[in-house]
């Protein structure tokens, strides 16, 4: 009942109510931001993550401050076309990022990366190197097991189609994947 009340309160939008947005960066350096995520430890560390398809991966530890700087993870991420970021609901220190933007074949990705220490170190998930274009990702708690779902696409790149199309699921931290829905039409 409480959940339904919360959902219902979100479903009504008064068009007369003005919403004011305040820019928080990363300024002139983050590229086009494609993904944003509140850190799973946000209540304790205030961290917000931002991922850009041409600017890398960033975090800010005080998003409420207009002067608090964004920290770039490393120059390595600049050209990876980061398109999605998600945290593990069962382990606040585990975060996944996906790469590759299918829209207009803007940038081929190199799969997914994972951190298990809150973002200090990252490892490429070699099981995902064929996933060239990632549309979205979510990590869900399924009866105590963290299930990672990713939507991947195939797109025309250098004259031929590249990538693996479908909806995929991993229950072992990205070591292996099960196809949930594959071979989606190129025009879907």
Give the residues covered by each predicted segment.
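Extracellular glycan-interacting surfaces
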Residues: 1-188
């Amino acid at each position: 009942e409480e959940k339904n009340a919360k959902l219902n309160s979100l479903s009504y939008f008064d068009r007369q109510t003005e919403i004011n947005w305040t820019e928080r960066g990363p300024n002139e350096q983050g590229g086009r931001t494609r993904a944003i995520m509140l850190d799973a430890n946000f209540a304790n560390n205030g961290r917000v993550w931002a991922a850009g398809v041409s600017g890398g991966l960033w975090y800010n530890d005080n998003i409420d401050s207009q002067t608090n700087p964004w920290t770039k993870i490393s120059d390595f991420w600049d050209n990876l076309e980061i398109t999605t970021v998600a945290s593990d609901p069962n382990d606040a220190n585990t975060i996944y990022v996906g790469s590759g933007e299918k829209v207009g074949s803007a940038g081929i990705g190199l799969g997914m990366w994972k951190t298990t220490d809150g973002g200090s170190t990252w490892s490429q998930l070699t099981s995902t190197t064929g996933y060239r274009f990632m549309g979205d990702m979510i990590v869900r708690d399924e009866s105590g097991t963290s299930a990672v779902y990713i939507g991947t696409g195939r797109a025309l790149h250098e004259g031929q189609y590249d990538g693996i199309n479908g909806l995929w699921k991993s229950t072992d931290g990205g070591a292996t994947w099960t196809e949930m829905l594959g071979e989606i039409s190129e025009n879907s």
